[in-house]
């Protein structure tokens, strides 16, 4: 099975922008999601913070709006990224982003 697709909405808590050595523009945001979902007929609180990476020219038009406090919905795929400390973490690479506020 090769499906890897995710849609997640939430509030941006941090953001930064940079260009790679190849000149590709990147925006990196920390997305905070809070909701309630039913699981096994019980209501549970759901909370997650996850890094989202937006790469390339298609995101340049919204990059200025990706600031702390802004609500967004992100569609993309998940992958592991190795941090400077050598530990892997799950991140989302965005394929689409929609501003909600």
UniProtKB/Swiss-Prot annotation:
Gene3D superfamilies: Nucleic acid-binding proteins
Keywords per UniProt: DNA replication, DNA-binding, Primosome
Lineage, uppermost ranks: Bacteria, Pseudomonadati, Pseudomonadota, Gammaproteobacteria, Alteromonadales
Organism (species): Shewanella sp. (strain W3-18-1)
One GO CC term on file: primosome complex
Recorded GO MF terms: single-stranded DNA binding
Keyword DNA-binding: yes
SUPFAM superfamilies per record: Nucleic acid-binding proteins
Function: Involved in the restart of stalled replication forks, which reloads the replicative helicase on sites other than the origin of replication; the PriA-PriB pathway is the major replication restart pathway. During primosome assembly it facilitates complex formation between PriA and DnaT on DNA; stabilizes PriA on DNA. Stimulates the DNA unwinding activity of PriA helicase.
One matching Pfam family: SSB_1
Family that this chain belongs to: Belongs to the PriB family.
Residue ranges constituting the SSB domain according to the UniProt record: 1-101
Claim: Electron transport is one of the keywords in the record: no
GO BP: any one term: DNA replication, synthesis of primer
Quaternary organization: Homodimer. Interacts with PriA and DnaT. Component of the replication restart primosome. Primosome assembly occurs via a 'hand-off' mechanism. PriA binds to replication forks, subsequently PriB then DnaT bind; DnaT then displaces ssDNA to generate the helicase loading substrate.
Alphabetical list of InterPro entries matching this protein: NA-bd_OB-fold, Primosome_PriB/ssb, Prisomal_replication_PriB
Record-given protein name: Replication restart protein PriB
């Amino acid at each position: 099975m090769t499906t890897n697709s995710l849609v997640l909405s939430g509030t941006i808590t941090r953001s930064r922008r940079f260009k790679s050595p190849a000149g590709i523009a990147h925006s990196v945001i920390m997305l905070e999601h809070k909701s309630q979902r039913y699981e096994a007929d019980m209501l549970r609180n759901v909370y997650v913070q996850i890094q989202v990476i937006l790469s390339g020219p298609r995101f340049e038009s919204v990059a200025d709006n990706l600031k702390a406090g802004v609500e967004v919905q992100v569609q993309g795929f998940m992958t592991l990224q190795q941090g400077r400390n050598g530990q892997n973490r799950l991140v989302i690479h965005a394929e689409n982003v929609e501003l909600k506020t």
